[in-house]
Amino acid sequence: MSETNERNRRHVYQGRVVSDKMDKTITVVVDTYKNHPVYNKRFRYSKKYYAQDENNEAKVGDTVRIMETRPLSRKKRFRLVKIVKKSV
């Protein structure tokens, strides 16, 4: 399998930065929606991810895109790809 196909299969999520207090690390909340299997009510499900921010450029409130990568630390498995929208 070629290198480009491997890289394209990685998960890419878009979420909101809720913490930037760590050096070169941001905490991103990703909101997704699920349907309840019995009642078919749609509800919001959120999950926090740690992401590598090499230049410390993302701030709290920014909307960012993160991509799955090799394990960078015990909890960090994502890296910052792009800041989609800056906070006010």
Swiss-Prot record:
The keyword Methyltransferase does not apply. Keywords: Ribonucleoprotein, Ribosomal protein, RNA-binding, rRNA-binding. It comes from the Bacteria. One of its GO terms (biological process) is translation. InterPro entries: NA-bd_OB-fold, Ribosomal_uS17, Ribosomal_uS17_bact/chlr, Ribosomal_uS17_CS. One of its GO terms (cellular component) is cytosolic small ribosomal subunit. One of the primary rRNA binding proteins, it binds specifically to the 5'-end of 16S ribosomal RNA. Belongs to the universal ribosomal protein uS17 family. NCBIfam families: PRK05610.1, uS17_bact. This is Small ribosomal subunit protein uS17. It comes from Lactobacillus acidophilus (strain ATCC 700396 / NCK56 / N2 / NCFM). The gene is rpsQ.
